[in-house]
């Protein structure tokens, strides 16, 4: 069945997602949360956490765009090379 992801691959993707989620959570928590004397989250901690997550999401988006651009360039180069090789001399 084309286009469907196997259960094994779905589990693998979910594990990768959880690993990424846990890493982001830990990094932002370590960077932003400083006061453990109260149960309340301070406004500056909330702001820091939001900025931390936004920064990660923007970075991920930028990397994905660059990765996609790279693959497009590679595919174009391969297509051009294949076109040159298939032309009669």
UniProtKB/Swiss-Prot annotation:
Membrane topology (UniProt): Peripheral membrane protein
GO biological process: protein transport
Cellular localization per UniProt: Mitochondrion inner membrane
Source domain of life: Eukaryota
Keyword Zinc carried by entry: yes
Disulfide bond entries: 28-52, 32-48
One Pfam family it belongs to: zf-Tim10_DDP
Primary site of residence: mitochondrion
Cellular-component GO terms for this entry: mitochondrial inner membrane
GO molecular function: metal ion binding
Motif Twin CX3C motif boundaries: 28-52
Keyword flag Protein biosynthesis: no
Swiss-Prot/TrEMBL keywords: Chaperone, Disulfide bond, Membrane, Metal-binding, Mitochondrion, Mitochondrion inner membrane, Protein transport, Translocation, Transport, Zinc
Residue spans crossing the bilayer: none
Function: Mitochondrial intermembrane chaperone that participates in the import and insertion of multi-pass transmembrane proteins into the mitochondrial inner membrane. May also be required for the transfer of beta-barrel precursors from the TOM complex to the sorting and assembly machinery (SAM complex) of the outer membrane. Acts as a chaperone-like protein that protects the hydrophobic precursors from aggregation and guide them through the mitochondrial intermembrane space.
Family label: Belongs to the small Tim family.
Self-association state and partner proteins as the record states: Heterohexamer; composed of 3 copies of TIMM9 and 3 copies of TIMM10/TIM10A, named soluble 70 kDa complex. The complex forms a 6-bladed alpha-propeller structure and associates with the TIMM22 component of the TIM22 complex. Interacts with multi-pass transmembrane proteins in transit.
Domain-level remarks: The twin CX3C motif contains 4 conserved Cys residues that form 2 disulfide bonds in the mitochondrial intermembrane space. However, during the transit of TIMM9 from cytoplasm into mitochondrion, the Cys residues probably coordinate zinc, thereby preventing folding and allowing its transfer across mitochondrial outer membrane.
Name by which UniProt lists this protein: Mitochondrial import inner membrane translocase subunit Tim9
Organism, scientific name: Gallus gallus (Chicken)
């Amino acid at each position: 069945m084309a286009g469907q992801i196997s259960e094994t691959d779905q589990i693998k993707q979910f594990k990768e997602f959880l690993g990424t989620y846990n890493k982001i959570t830990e990094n932002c928590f370590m960077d932003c949360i400083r006061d453990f004397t109260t149960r309340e989250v301070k406004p500056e901690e909330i702001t820091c956490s939001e900025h931390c997550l936004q920064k990660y999401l923007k970075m991920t988006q930028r990397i994905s765009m660059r990765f996609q651009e790279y693959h497009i360039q590679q595919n174009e180069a391969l297509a051009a090379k294949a076109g040159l090789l298939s032309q009669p001399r």
